[in-house]
Amino acid sequence: MRMLVSKSIFAEPEPGYYAHTPVSLVICAPNMPDLLSHRLEDGFRAASRHAEALAKLQYRDPNAKDVLGFQLAFSTTKSYWDYVEEDDPECGQRFSKAMRAVTVNKLGDVPKLYPFNKLVDDGGIIVDVGGGMGQVAQSILSHWHGLGLKCIVQDKFASKSGSTHPDLEMQSYDFFSPQPVKGSAAYLFRHIFHDWPDDACITILKNTVEAMNPHQSRILICDQIMEETNPSTAAVLYDIDMMCLYGGKERTLSEWEELLKAADQRLEIKNVFRSPNQVSGILEVQLCCD
């Protein structure tokens, strides 16, 4: 306890008596132990072999087929996603619960940050790509209720019976395949692209562009937008974590622009929505039709 007090995780108001701090209360939050477990059991193991993996790559950015710290630490040739699906479902469950903790703590950011009411005139259909169990979609519908918005939550393991909201539909979909929902007002990607290297992201974006209505559809990317210089400690730690486990990375605004142009020269960032003192934001991307 003394060590935890010295790190400001707990307080010691008087000798022999200990009290919670804001830090310890966060640790007690629902699913937070799963997030810590994911970071320690998966992230730290992968990080322990990160330097070795980088040396094998000759210190270049990885692509989707490269061997990463994760593969070396877990003695596999499979990607993280294939590994947890096929070989270690317990690891996959740990990740799912960890992401649930992240979603719960950040749930209010998305519906408040972007003016979803502007989508109504373009049909009001929001496709939440890789949207998991639909928590974010439900928060959008609750915050902007009564406007006629509808959400389609796409996830590889989505269950059609998993939706309890009348304006929410669950749809099984792998975003490396052609997008089946055409001409939606918005295609939302929340914390998707930072899990993947550029070549994989380009494939996802190209599949999305093929489905877009060039005059009204937009892509909404909710992800970190790193500072161009002197990024925060939190941002660079996430950046390393993404590379060790998945081969992904956090991106600066200029890197987002380069990625979008690599997928389709017509893609342009029209607006950037950010909260003060927050690394994450929402990029509103549309096709430029001159």
From Swiss-Prot:
InterPro entries: COMT-like (IPR016461), O_MeTrfase_dom (IPR001077), SAM-dependent_MTases_sf (IPR029063)
Binding site for S-adenosyl-L-methionine: D155
Disruption phenotype: Impairs the production of aspergillicins A and F but accumulates aspergillicins C and G.
Entry GO MF terms: O-methyltransferase activity
Summary of the protein's practical applications: Aspergillicins show innate immunity-modulating activity. Innate immunity is a good pharmaceutical target for the development of immune regulators to suppress unwanted immune responses, such as septic shock, inflammatory diseases, and autoimmune diseases. The innate immune system also provides targets for the development of agents that stimulate protective immune responses toward some diseases, such as infections with pathogenic organisms and cancer.
PROSITE patterns per record: SAM_OMT_II
EC number(s) from the headed UniProt entry: 2.1.1.-
Any one GO BP annotation for this protein: methylation
Pathway terms, separated by semicolons: Secondary metabolite biosynthesis
Keywords per UniProt: Methyltransferase, S-adenosyl-L-methionine, Transferase
Active site, renumbered: H194
Family of this protein: Belongs to the class I-like SAM-binding methyltransferase superfamily. Cation-independent O-methyltransferase family.
Function: O-methyltransferase; part of the gene cluster that mediates the biosynthesis of the aspergillicins A and F, 2 cryptic cyclic hexa-depsipeptides. The hexamodular NRPS agiA catalyzes the condensation of the six amino acid residues including N-Me-L-O-Me-tyrosine, L-proline 1, L-proline 2, D-isoleucine, O-acetyl-threonine, and L-isoleucine. The starting condensation domain (C1) of agiA probably loads acetyl-CoA which is condensed on the N-terminus of threonine by the first module to yield O-acetyl-threonine. The second module then loads L-isoleucine.
Protein name stated in the entry: O-methyltransferase agiB
